[in-house]
């Protein structure tokens, strides 16, 4: 994921080929203020060594940095939950999330053009509450009835159920988390990290729209959205 305008950008995660990231920003690394990483699992930090060999600063929790063991020309910058950091013109507040890894973070990111952007993935619930949100990227990984049906029909092992319940956000938890936060000024809700087999994108989008009354998107490769502070 990339938050960007004509002159600056902030990369969220680096779990895909870095060449794909560079293509998305027209190979203009000079505009990138930094790369935020939530945790050390490879689908979120696979390209970290490549990023550390560029001018792009990498930011994560101390626990994530140690677990990633990234190797490059530069060292990652450790962040602390609850402290506010200026990364370029992006104001970043890391917060703790709940996942099966060292020290996972979510991020509240504020910019004059986007307003407050909530980024929360790979967490089985959202412990914090946030005010005056403008845009939201949040995990909706599975729905319990679909997961249970897949187990009953032998499509996935039962052991995966326990791991999923303790590491990823269900549709119901996602809906409840959203409704527990201040959505009055929200322009976009983007559902991310949907399980290939344990979710239903169309039903998830409609369910969150019905619950919140907001515009809801399912994240897709190449998707471009206007994350404005105001709806116009």
Named regions from a protein language model:
Residues 3, 39, 92, 99, ...:
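Divalent metal-coordination and catalytic microenvironments
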Residues 46-55, 70-71, 199-207:
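Metal-dependent catalytic neighborhoods of phosphoester/phosphodiester hydrolases
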Residues 61-114:
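Metallo-beta-lactamase
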Residues 17-63:
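Active-site metal-binding motif and surrounding structural segment of the metallo-beta-lactamase
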Residues 131-222:
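Cap/insert and terminal regions of metallo-dependent hydrolase folds
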Residues 1-27, 105-122, 134-135, 144:
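Conserved beta-strand hairpin/beta-sheet module of binuclear metal-dependent hydrolase folds
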Residues 14-16, 40, 97-100, 121-123, ...:
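Active-site metal-binding loops of divalent metal-dependent hydrolases
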Residues 40-46, 65-67, 101-102, 126-128, ...:
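Active-site environment of divalent metal-dependent phosphoester hydrolases
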